[in-house]
Amino acid sequence: MKIDRDRLDYLMKDAVQGFTRYLGLVPLSLKPGEFVTRIRLQKKHFQQDGFAHAGLIATIADHTAGYASFSLVPADRRILTIEYKINYFQPADGDYLECHGKVTKPGRNILFTEAEVYSIKGKSRKLVARAMHTMASVPASRVSRPSDT
């Protein structure tokens, strides 16, 4: 499967709005069933001990896996997370978080994904979390989207 240029442009723009824009998420690459994103860590992202907050790590994993799924469904469908499980391996203390999301089992209505989150500091890259998701593909008409403000 190939993503046409209009769909690719839409997905790359759509991935950064609202909360993800506030967090500073940047899409790096998108191909069918795979999405890579990055966040430059700032003071607002850290918890009390100076590491990237676990909620931030979970958010980038969920969002990136969601858009990996979104790349495989028709334009008249949306992706919603049904459930996910995340394992944290070590604190994220780098300059960036980078997430690689991929669809492991596509389906018409249900998709299964994985996401790996890395902490990047200089040339060093360490795996800090891995998540598994179950995603639902639903008709866009069933999902009300607020305007982007």
Predicted feature residues:
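Terminal targeting signals and extreme-terminal segments of soluble enzymes
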Residues: 1-149
